[in-house]
């Protein structure tokens, strides 16, 4: 289409051909330990790249090998899947298996996860497209705003808000002189606009009303198994109901932003975006199914176990390959990668129904984090916890410095607390660091300049946490 500056097919910016070793190396930048889990997801991602190179007939026959990650909370299960999706620019959805109910019961049915993934895919593609047309949209928005501020005689398409004091009409007799004077004035206005000298001015824009996302009379359909019917009815009514423009008074910076969004929307090719969103969700979608152990049954089934088995049976066709109607069209789930995870303390993977077990052929056990792992988590990742706190407090002029013995002491306390109480993995570090830095976070902005350099060494950590650690009741609830 000639109106759209980008005519080539949209492709994910991160769809590069990384080898499994390179994928693991990139995951290592953010996640400590868990080599086996990283290898499993790296192979799964690489197999997608391999599959794309095959002829269509063979491509259709190759399905993703879904993965079950087994390990306690806080060891990196979710983070591995999340980082993997970012690495390949894939639509990613994390859901909890316990949130779904068997068909016929009140609650969300399992197909809703595919509908949610489709919406994520559409938003992802739209954002990528907007990034590509950002400069064009900015230029068009600037011209549109100048048209409002200083319209050609008799013209004002978007709204009103002319700034007076400029001769733009019959005061100049000659047409050419009038045009030259107008263009000079327009450039003068452009400079004022770019330098922010017009930021206090208000303009009235005639902008399209956002599409109605919910029709009140249909909200009764917004839950449970009627999600799909609700979506279809809203889509139909959205097309039938007239779209009206709405006049809004905005300051110049806000008006410019609103016009940029409006112009970007005009540059967007809805059919192309929808096609790419559909392709992306079907070929690259990743669903992280957490707490799958909670829907695993046990021997001697009670009523609750029977209900859990119902969810498993509803989940089976989605994982196996089905077609689900969504807002962007029918989505085939055959090639969506499912990564399930669970602690499996009270159950084991073999407690899942055999048919579902067969759809998750790869099983990876994640290791419990050691004291050395905690030390690495605090320092090695690109956005490690210590770097995050250093960056946050630097905005108040506080210079945090973590010494080696300070890091070791924090890691030791985290490991010991996990051993003595509930093992929450790396999340224990968050609670400890919050407690440790509570005082400096609160007092920091008011500290004199001479006290704004804070060194977190072993003694600092011990002094602030020893009392809490020694008090068993306190440590259980605070750390």
From Swiss-Prot:
InterPro entries: AAA+_ATPase, ATP-dep_Clp_protease_ClpX, ATPase_AAA_core, ATPase_dyneun-rel_AAA, Clp_ATPase_C, HslU, P-loop_NTPase. Pfam families: AAA_2, AAA_5. GO terms for biological process: protein unfolding; proteolysis involved in protein catabolic process. ATP binds at residues 32, 74-79, 290, 355, 427. GO terms for cellular component: HslUV protease complex. It is found in: Cytoplasm. Keywords: ATP-binding, Chaperone, Cytoplasm, Nucleotide-binding. SUPFAM superfamilies: P-loop containing nucleoside triphosphate hydrolases. One of its GO terms (molecular function) is ATP binding. Belongs to the ClpX chaperone family. HslU subfamily. A double ring-shaped homohexamer of HslV is capped on each side by a ring-shaped HslU homohexamer. The assembly of the HslU/HslV complex is dependent on binding of ATP. ATPase subunit of a proteasome-like degradation complex; this subunit has chaperone activity. The binding of ATP and its subsequent hydrolysis by HslU are essential for unfolding of protein substrates subsequently hydrolyzed by HslV. HslU recognizes the N-terminal part of its protein substrates and unfolds these before they are guided to HslV for hydrolysis. This is ATP-dependent protease ATPase subunit HslU.
């Amino acid at each position: 289409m000639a109106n759209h500056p980008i005519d080539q097919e949209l492709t994910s910016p991160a769809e590069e051909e990384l080898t499994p070793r390179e994928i693991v190396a990139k995951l290592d930048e953010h996640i400590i330990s868990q080599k086996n889990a990283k290898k499993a997801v790296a192979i799964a991602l690489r197999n997608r790249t391999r599959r794309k190179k095959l002829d269509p007939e063979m491509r259709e026959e190759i399905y993703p090998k879904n993965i079950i990650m087994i390990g306690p909370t806080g060891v990196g299960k979710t983070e591995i899947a999340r980082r993997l999706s970012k690495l390949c620019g894939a639509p990613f959805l994390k859901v909890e298996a316990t949130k779904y109910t068997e068909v016929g019961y009140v609650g969300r049915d399992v197909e809703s996860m595919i509908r949610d993934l489709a919406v994520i895919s559409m938003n992802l593609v739209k954002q990528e497209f907007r990034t590509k047309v950002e400069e064009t949209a900015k230029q068009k928005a600037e011209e549109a705003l100048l048209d409002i501020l200083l319209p050609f005689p008799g013209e004002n398409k978007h709204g009103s808000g002319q700034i007076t004091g400029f001769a733009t009409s019959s005061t100049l007799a000659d047409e050419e002189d009038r045009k030259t004077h107008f263009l000079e004035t327009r450039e003068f206005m452009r400079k004022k606009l770019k330098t922010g000298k017009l930021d206090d001015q208000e303009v009235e824009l005639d902008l399209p009303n956002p599409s109605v996302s919910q029709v009140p009379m249909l909200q009764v359909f917004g839950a449970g198994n009627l999600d799909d019917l609700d979506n279809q009815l809203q889509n139909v009514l959205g097309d039938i109901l007239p779209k009206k423009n709405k006049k809004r008074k905005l300051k110049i910076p806000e008006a410019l932003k609103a016009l940029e969004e409006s112009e970007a929307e005009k540059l967007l090719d809805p059919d192309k975006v929808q096609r790419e969103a559909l392709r992306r969700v079907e070929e690259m979608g990743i669903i992280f199914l957490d707490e799958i152990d909670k829907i695993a049954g046990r021997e001697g089934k009670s009523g609750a176990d029977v209900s859990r088995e119902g969810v498993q049976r509803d989940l089976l066709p989605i994982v196996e390959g089905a077609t689900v109607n969504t807002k962007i069209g029918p989505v085939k789930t055959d090639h969506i990668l499912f990564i399930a995870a669970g602690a499996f303390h009270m159950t084991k993977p073999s407690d899942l129904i055999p048919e579902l077990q067969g759809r998750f052929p790869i099983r990876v056990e994640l290791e419990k984090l050691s004291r050395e792992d905690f030390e690495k988590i605090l320092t090695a990742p690109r956005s490690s916890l210590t770097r995050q706190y250093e960056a946050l407090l630097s905005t108040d002029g506080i210079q945090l410095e973590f010494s080696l013995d300070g890091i070791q002491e924090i890691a030791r306390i985290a490991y010991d607390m996990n051993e003595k109480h509930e093992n929450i993995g790396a999340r224990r570090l968050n609670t400890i660091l919050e407690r440790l830095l509570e005082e400096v976070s609160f007092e920091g902005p008011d500290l004199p300049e001479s006290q704004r350099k804070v060194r977190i060494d072993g003694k600092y950590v011990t002094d602030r946490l020893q009392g809490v650690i020694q008090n068993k009741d306190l440590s259980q609830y605070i750390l």
